[in-house]
């Protein structure tokens, strides 16, 4: 996100929350390492079996090729694979403990806010992004309410596309391509607008016009040429144009230009608003997940504020997002 007076969650906020969580997760990690000093049996056996089998296969090939010297190579490979398996098991164990410690600290923060952490966030297929691909899945995240009535969830969302390829003999191979996102989903009814999409681009550009031809969304050029050149704003074909312009007043257009979208994109449909960025959320960068949630909160306010067209109250929204002591 670009720094500006309309930022709800700043770079300083992200660094502060990440620093606090890093300190807490290190304490948790030290405690977990005392409780679980050695990798589990599974973590030790999986790399050991895999590497030893690979070493044996390579060693047998060497024996077949160079005889007795290959046998010596086989022994060396097996011994090396045992040591390598131990290193991998240790790395796997440490990585798992660090991830667990980070999630524990995130869980503590979420609990202090009245939220909860989940292994899989619940996402209904309410917007085009959440319906994309041939199959979809979710990962870890947080969910709860902001204030009394604003329900949200934020975390990992992945849609997968099936890809097939054929060789010269007509044999077909199928593979799956993953498209991971960090998303924040929040309730929002866009009165008079219905559904919308806004992302980096040009509202009056060729891609916006093509999108309007093949989807139920149409581009809406506004008064600010700088806005139109920076953002692609699409709304329902049957949207009330007056309602759109009541929301996107000149002062709101200036706020968009000042604030920027960073790498976020937004969709709203069926009473839900989605803020999304490419890439999965990381447990060692919880601030980035909070940043996406902040984007969703700010955008929701633009579309639901009453009276329409006023600038979001940043101080009030920061208290909503970060708590009364923000």
Model segments located where?
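Short, charged cytosolic
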Residues: 1-31
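Charged, low-complexity intrinsically disordered regions
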Residues: 15-23, 33-44, 105-165, 171-326
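Select subsegments of transmembrane alpha-helices in polytopic membrane proteins
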Residues: 42-52
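Hydrophobic, membrane-inserted alpha-helices
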Residues: 53-60
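Terminal low-complexity, poorly structured segments
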Residues: 58, 70, 313-317
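Hydrophobic alpha-helical transmembrane segments
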Residues: 61-80
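Residue-level detector of alpha-helix boundaries and kinks
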Residues: 73, 91, 95, 281-284, ...
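Transmembrane-cytosolic junction motif
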Residues: 81-109
């Amino acid at each position: 996100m670009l720094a500006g007076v309309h930022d709800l969650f700043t770079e300083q906020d992200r660094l502060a929350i990440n620093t606090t969580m890093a300190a807490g997760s290190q304490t948790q990690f030290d405690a977990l390492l005392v409780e679980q000093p050695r990798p589990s049996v599974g973590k030790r056996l999986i790399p050991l079996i895999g590497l030893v089998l690979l070493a044996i296969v390579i060693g047998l090939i060497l024996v077949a090729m160079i005889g007795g010297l290959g046998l010596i190579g086989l022994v060396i490979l097996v011994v090396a694979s045992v040591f390598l398996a131990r290193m991998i098991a240790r790395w796997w164990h440490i990585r798992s403990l660090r991830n667990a410690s980070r999630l524990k600290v995130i869980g503590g923060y979420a609990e202090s806010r009245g939220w909860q952490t989940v292994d899989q966030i619940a996402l209904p297929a309410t917007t085009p992004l959440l319906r994309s691909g041939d199959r979809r899945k979710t990962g870890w995240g947080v969910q709860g309410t902001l204030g009394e009535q604003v329900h949200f969830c934020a975390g990992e969302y992945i849609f997968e596309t099936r890809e097939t390829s054929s060789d010269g003999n007509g044999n077909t191979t199928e593979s799956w391509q993953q498209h991971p996102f960090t998303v924040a989903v929040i309730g929002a009814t866009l009165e008079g607008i219905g559904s919308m999409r806004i992302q980096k681009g040009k509202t009056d550009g060729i891609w916006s016009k093509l999108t309007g031809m093949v989807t139920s969304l149409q581009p809406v050029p506004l008064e600010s040429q700088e806005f139109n050149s920076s953002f692609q704003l699409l709304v329902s074909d049957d949207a009330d144009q007056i309602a759109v312009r009541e929301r996107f007043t000149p002062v709101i257009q200036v706020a968009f230009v000042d604030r920027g979208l960073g790498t976020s994109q937004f969709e709203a449909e069926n009473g839900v608003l989605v803020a999304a960025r490419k890439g999965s959320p990381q447990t060692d960068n919880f601030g980035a997940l909070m940043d996406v949630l902040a984007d969703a909160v700010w955008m929701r306010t633009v579309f639901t504020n009453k009276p329409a067209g006023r600038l979001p109250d940043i101080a009030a929204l920061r208290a909503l997002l970060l708590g009364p002591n923000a």
